[in-house]
Amino acid sequence: PGTCSCLRHGENYDDNSCLRDIGSGGKYAEPVFECNVLCRCSDHCRNRVVQKGLQFHFQVFKTHKKGWGLRTLEFIPKGRFVCEYAGEVLGFSEVQRRIHLQTKSDSNYIIAIREHVYNGQVMETFVDPTYIGNIGRFLNHSCEPNLLMIPVRIDSMVPKLALFAAKDIVPEEELSYDYSGRYLNLT
């Protein structure tokens, strides 16, 4: 297939659908914009990865100490898209309202992604998978995670919270990411 005109500004993924550059030591990530409905490329364009959805088999399982968890049933190479952390996209006031209504026994799955855009401005996206979500809600925290969360934009400026393999992941390994937004506890 020919080269998509969307890729003239840089390529997000390699020929194996792996995130091209997780950054220096996996600490940072560049913004990812995938082809969208306005793009003339085919559905097979290599700049369409997250929008294709799950490509691996997973299992929700009961962990020994953390409640439910998610593990892969097959090998996942470093850089591959694993799953989206999907849920309701909320405004800040709704996030505050929901947190205020929670009791100490309620779980909180709301995640805040802060992106530094320009002139010191910060763009925030809040996602709550409590009522509407997918398998991403079963991911547990780890200070040594095997996933990295990257905001990916497709047909909207509201990003999809995409989780990519930060390292090669073997079958039966529990999938995890750092809830703080850091990777491997590096600042």
PLM regions: where:
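Accessory low-complexity/Zn-finger-associated flanking regions
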Residues: P1-W68, G181, T187
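Active-site-adjacent structural elements in folded domains
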Residues: L19-D21, V158-L161
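Catalytic cores of histone-lysine modification enzymes
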Residues: K27-Y28, F33, V37, R48-R153, ...
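Active-site pocket scaffolds in enzymes
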Residues: L148, D155-M157, Y179
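Exposed beta-sheet edge/beta-hairpin loop segments within beta-rich domains
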Residues: L163-I169
